[in-house]
């Protein structure tokens, strides 16, 4: 392929179903108490967050990832989780809470340099006629003692989502090299 054809092919407009990178955050030395994406535009139908995360929590091999939309910390959220670690299955629910417990992530008690991975889909984030929902898949491998979890969340608000804030459930900081990437998904 000639260089001109390659440039032409790579410069096409996004098609329905394509994911476009909106923003990324990589936590620097010293960690970060939170990560927030702000001023999210309305060019997409759905959002997706892909993250690899580790926190400073030392009380267990995992920590939780919390999500709040548009700065709302009132009891307008609900969430569900099912998962397991290869030996034990679990199911959890939270209703009328101030955040969505969105994922299990690695903690400082997990093996050295181990990060949890999660993919979170925020559906119809700009639709002002319905509450906002998300679904997620998360996992941690800890030398054979891993954890896998599927979850969903609800924000009982019809406002378009313009910001997403991530914090820890038990820890106080995301560790250096934790990485969050926000994508927008086009639709027809």
Residue ranges: model-predicted function:
Residues 2-188:
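Surface-exposed molecular-recognition determinants
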